[in-house]
Amino acid sequence: MKDNVHPNYKDVVFHDVTSDFKILTRSTMTSKETVKWEDGQEYPLIKVEISSSSHPFYTGKHKVIDTGGRIDKFQKRYAR
């Protein structure tokens, strides 16, 4: 493998600001912000607006929003 070709892969903390969930993982992303983790070390902090901790699909709080009766119209058209 060639030297200096691959990105720097290191430990980072992802922070879901919606649910205040933090996870320590590895990534090539960088950040000027740092956070002190449970092990006492400081890691780069990557803030995200949505993750599996707050996304409706993963939390089970998914809602179907019917705009203008489109679902009813579809069901009437294709009802058997």
From Swiss-Prot:
What GO annotations for molecular function exist for this entry?
A: structural constituent of ribosome
UniProt KW Transcription keyword: no
**Keyword tags:** Ribonucleoprotein, Ribosomal protein
Entries under InterPro entries matching the protein: Ribosomal_bL28/bL31-like_sf, Ribosomal_bL31, Ribosomal_bL31_B, Ribosomal_bL31_sf
Which Pfam families does this UniProt record tie to the protein? Answer: Ribosomal_L31
Highest rank taxon of the organism: Bacteria
Keyword set includes Ribosomal protein: yes
Q: Which GO terms describe its cellular component?
A: ribonucleoprotein complex; ribosome
Signal peptide range in chain numbering: none
Against PROSITE patterns, the record matches this protein to: RIBOSOMAL_L31
Gene Ontology BP term (one): translation
Q: Fill in the subunit field for this protein.
A: Part of the 50S ribosomal subunit.
Report the sequence similarity comment from the record: Belongs to the bacterial ribosomal protein bL31 family. Type B subfamily.
Per its record, how is this protein called by name? Large ribosomal subunit protein bL31B
